[in-house]
Regions:
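Alpha-helical transmembrane segments of multi-pass membrane proteins
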Residues: 33-44, 69-77, 97-105
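Alpha-helical phosphate/pyrophosphate-handling elements in metalloenzyme active cores
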Residues: 8-22
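Loop-to-helix transition at the N-terminal end of transmembrane alpha-helices
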Residues: 28-42, 58-63
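Juxtamembrane helix-capping/reentrant segments at transmembrane boundaries
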Residues: 51-72
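A cytosolic-side transmembrane-helix exit/cap motif
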Residues: 49-58, 109-117
Length: 137
C-alpha cells in the first residue's frame, strides 16, 4: 500500500513540476489568473442555476475554454523562452488579456445575479458587449 501512495505522490510531483515549467512558474500573475478563472466559472454556474439552464454540456464546454486559456499561457511562455530567449513579455501579455477578459465576464455574471455594478462600469460593459455582437455578425 505504501508503494501505491509513493507512486501517486511521484505522479503528482511530476505533473506539478511540468506544469510549473510549462506555465512559467507560479508567480502573482498566474495566481491572479487562476483566481479569476475559478471565480468566473463559479459565477457562471450560479447564473445558469438562477436561469434554470444548468447543463453538463455547457459546463464541459466552459471547462474546455478555461483549460485552453492555460494552454495559451504555456505556449506564450515557450515562445518567450525558446524563441525570444529572455524575459516573459508574451506570457505576461497573454495573462493580462485573459485576466481582463475574465474580469469583464465576472462583472457581467455579477450584474446578471443582481449585484449592483457602478454605472460607469455598466456603460463600458455594454460597449464591449455591443462590439462583440457586431464582430459575431
Amino acid at each position: 500500500m505504501k508503494e501505491f501512495w509513493n507512486t501517486i505522490q511521484l505522479i503528482f510531483a511530476g505533473v506539478g513540476g511540468w506544469l510549473g515549467y510549462f506555465l512559467g512558474g507560479c508567480d502573482g500573475l498566474l495566481y491572479a489568473l487562476i483566481a479569476f478563472v475559478v471565480i468566473d466559472y463559479i459565477t457562471g454556474v450560479m447564473c445558469a442555476i438562477s436561469n434554470h439552464t444548468l447543463s453538463s454540456e455547457v459546463g464541459f464546454k466552459g471547462i474546455c475554454r478555461k483549460v485552453l486559456i492555460f494552454l495559451l499561457v504555456g505556449i506564450a511562455n515557450i515562445l518567450d523562452i525558446q524563441v525570444i530567449g529572455s524575459g516573459s513579455a508574451l506570457r505576461t501579455a497573454v495573462i493580462f488579456f485573459y485576466i481582463s477578459n475574465e474580469g469583464v465576464s465576472l462583472l457581467e455574471n455579477a450584474a446578471h445575479l443582481g449585484l449592483p455594478i457602478p454605472e460607469k462600469i455598466k456603460v463600458v460593459l455594454e460597449q464591449l458587449h455591443d462590439r462583440s455582437t457586431k464582430e459575431e455578425n
